[in-house]
Amino acid sequence: MPSPQGRVSLVAFNPFDHRGIPIDDQIRNWGQLDVAPIDPDNADPYTKCRIITMNGIEAEAIMFSHHFARVCPDLDTRQLLAKVRYVEQQQQKLVNWLLPGQASVLETTLSYEQVATDLTGWVARMEPDPYLKACYEFGLLEDFDHLYRYANLYEMIEHRKAEKIVDGLTEVMPGRPTYQQHRDPLDNVRQPYDRETAAPLSKLHALTIMAAEQQTMNFYMNMGPLYMEPIARQLYQEIGMVEEEHVTHYESMLDPHETWYERLVNHEYNECYLYYSFMQTESDPRIKGFWELHLNMELEHLRLACDLMRRAEDRDPEAMLPRELPEPVTFEQNKTYIRQLLATQIDYTTLGTGIVQEAHERFEAMQDRINAERPSTEIVIDEHRHKFGEEYRLETEGPHPVPRLREKPYQ
């Protein structure tokens, strides 16, 4: 593998000014893909979060490329998609294989929910569109609750505490209770942004969170049935159904009028943005090197996607995206922000494409039907309290901001 053509500066960066590594030089051999995983005991939790995020981003890039190829009649385009997609698959293999085999499925699950909490928290804080911001805040309180439910399962099954995984960076306590997250599917579809007027950052945010939630959904779909314990199987099933709602929620925020070529450019630009972001914020020098290498690959993918769009649509893709990458996506604590949302938005649900505070007939009908038996997300807390005399929580900033959700003495 040749060295990247010029190291990337950590100042304002224009991805259109860099060619990166030529596509014909990007395929790696097995030895280059066989990377040592991170240390499960000593790695920065946010390093693991960045790995999980980029795995989801690469998985989305791969599946988008496959879907594009299935509807594209142009042979040259399909061949180039295949060429780039093969490299994306190698990138996904390297990134996902950085996760340590010693980590249990539940430990990785806790990290997935830490991603869902702190990545969505950052995006929500940075989102310029008020409606889209509200959509991110809505989903954030739901994934925050999933972290709490899985943390209680983790201590019950593995007799270890989630603070070992989240390292005090993310609190563990109830969010919007998961049993209240089951809505009529009609109420999971949001209004899309307008491709002509939306801020470019809004487009990148939507792609990022959609891909992350999609990866979480797929992970739970595949990992849930591998457990023997009934409560674990049930919990993954219930939360997995909420992830279906979340993918619907986030994917519907993308403008369906974007052309396939436009979407391809957006995907490649977003990959450049995220690899660049994580290269700047990564604490592990070895992992930072992988982010830089993949950035230099993605710069070439972006160039090729732009060339395809110019040829197919006679449009300049650089006119629809910023010349300089936005402020880097950063994994950081969101404790104060989440507590503010808990105090003000805990009872929200959705009606049509809007977010409302009052329950309504369609919501209540869905609740009555799906929660006819006590849901696993409540049972897991019951069983933890019965076994340990208390819930598992990690409340580093004081009591829960919602009085009714504060832990009550076990009787």
Residue map of PLM features:
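Non-heme di-metal
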Residues: 2-411
